[in-house]
UniProtKB/Swiss-Prot annotation:
CDD domains: SAICAR_synt_Sc
GO cellular component: cytoplasm
Organism phylogeny: Bacteria, Pseudomonadati, Pseudomonadota, Gammaproteobacteria, Alteromonadales
GO MF, any single term: phosphoribosylaminoimidazolesuccinocarboxamide synthase activity
Family, similarity comment: Belongs to the SAICAR synthetase family.
Record-level GO BP terms: 'de novo' IMP biosynthetic process
Organism: Shewanella sp. (strain ANA-3)
Name under which the protein is recorded: Phosphoribosylaminoimidazole-succinocarboxamide synthase
Enzyme category, top tier: ligase
PANTHER family with a match to the protein in the record: PHOSPHORIBOSYLAMINOIMIDAZOLE-SUCCINOCARBOXAMIDE SYNTHASE (PTHR43700:SF1)
Catalytic activity: 5-amino-1-(5-phospho-D-ribosyl)imidazole-4-carboxylate + L-aspartate + ATP = (2S)-2-[5-amino-1-(5-phospho-beta-D-ribosyl)imidazole-4-carboxamido]succinate + ADP + phosphate + 2 H(+)
Length: 367
């Protein structure tokens, strides 16, 4: 098996029994199970959900996206070795820690394979729940140009790049394109304020206006749990994005849960603590890959300018990145995952074959 064979790049072609189209995201693909299979698994596996809950198989890939494009490497390498397993392992660890700290549940019911989650269907909140402890990235770029109000929050004068903020900030943005909301442009990833959410809470998917307080509490509490655990590993939790949704419990009550992934190198910035104390930034997240791309290509404006999207897509499609750059990303992801979980990240030689075997023999889901 070659290195390229060990990478799961295409994850939407598994022969999983489903009666609806596979939903393919940038990194994960979702297979909605039939009603019969959902009910059977809930009964035979003892999942703590109502028997009519729709279930899905969520399969992560090793693809890497940046600046809204998928990149690839030399030698037919269509992803980052170990990336998918690392992301899932980190999220699994944090979700377990959340439960131990009395926070909300997640959508995950079962983990058949390092690349696979069995999840319950949730009603998503249409908000990217972003939390920031340091001023860096897009916030710093805007601040350095004179902007002081972010998502309805006014920042003080005199802040410096990469410094710790006086308070933990919640700076939400829209999840997907939302139409008909006063003052909110119909564009993806638009910054919004708490006042925007309160005035239009149902349009953003909240069932009760009081749940806005709950989502902010779960966001801050989750951030603090991860931040403390990372600090014990001499890592700095800089900022992150969470997602939330509603599910119905066995008593028929609606409850807010964590969705997607949490505290990963894809959804967060994580800095090395020792380097930060020395005045340097050593990224243990995808931000390092973004910085590599900005330095690698002669015209970085293509990656930053949304008006040049066709050029950006061509750049990603037509340029194979150096193998060493791809392996550097692999080492970043597997390294931080092993720090967080305390265990080695499995790198199966043929992950697709392994997934099919498990889902056939242990779950009877392969056609």
């Amino acid at each position: 098996m070659s290195l390229a064979d060990s990478v799961l790049a295409v994850n939407n072609d598994l022969p999983i029994r489903t009666n609806s189209p596979v939903h393919s995201g940038k990194v994960r693909s979702v297979y909605w199970l039939t009603d019969a299979d959902s009910r059977r698994l809930i009964q035979t596996k003892g999942y703590n959900v109502p028997e009519d809950t729709p279930l899905a198989i969520m399969v992560i890939s090793d693809r890497i996206s940046a600046f809204d494009c998928i990149f690839h490497g030399e030698g037919g390498l269509k992803g980052i070795p170990g990336k998918g397993a690392a992301l899932n392992a980190i999220s699994n660890h944090w979700f377990k820690l959340f439960a131990e700290n009395g926070l909300a549940d997640s959508h995950i019911l079962d983990i058949p394979h390092p690349f696979v989650w069995i999840v319950q269907k949730a009603r998503p909140i249409k908000v990217e729940a972003i939390c920031r402890q340091y001023i860096t990235g897009s916030m710093w770029r805007a601040y350095s140009k004179g902007e002081r109000v972010f998502c309805g929050i006014t920042l003080p004068e005199g802040l410096e790049k990469d410094q710790k903020l006086p308070d933990l900030l919640i700076t939400p943005s829209t999840k997907g394109i939302l139409t008909g909301i006063p003052g909110v442009p119909a564009q993806d990833d638009v910054n919004i304020s708490r006042a925007d959410i309160e005035a239009n809470y149902q349009a953003f998917g909240f069932e009760k206006v009081e749940d806005i307080d709950l989502y902010e509490k779960l966001l801050k509490d989750g951030f603090k749990v991860i931040s403390k655990a990372l600090a014990d590993l001499d890592q700095v939790f800089v900022d992150t994005k969470f997602e939330f949704g509603y599910v119905t419990d066995k008593n028929g009550n609606s409850k807010l849960i964590y969705m997607d992934e949490v505290g990963t190198p894809d959804s967060s910035r994580i800095w090395d603590g020792a380097a930060y104390r020395d005045g340097k930034i050593l990224e243990n997240s995808k931000e390092g890959f973004r910085q590599f791309l900005l330095n690698h290509f002669p015209d970085p404006d293509i990656l930053l300018n949304k008006d040049r999207m066709p050029e950006r897509e061509a750049l990603a499609r037509d340029n194979a990145l150096p193998l060493e750059a791809m392996m550097n990303v692999s080492r970043t992801y597997t390294g931080i995952a092993e720090k967080v979980t305390g265990a080695a990240i499995p790198l199966p030689a043929n992950p697709k074959a392994d997934i099919i075997k498990i889902l056939r023999e242990e779950y009877d889901l392969i056609v």
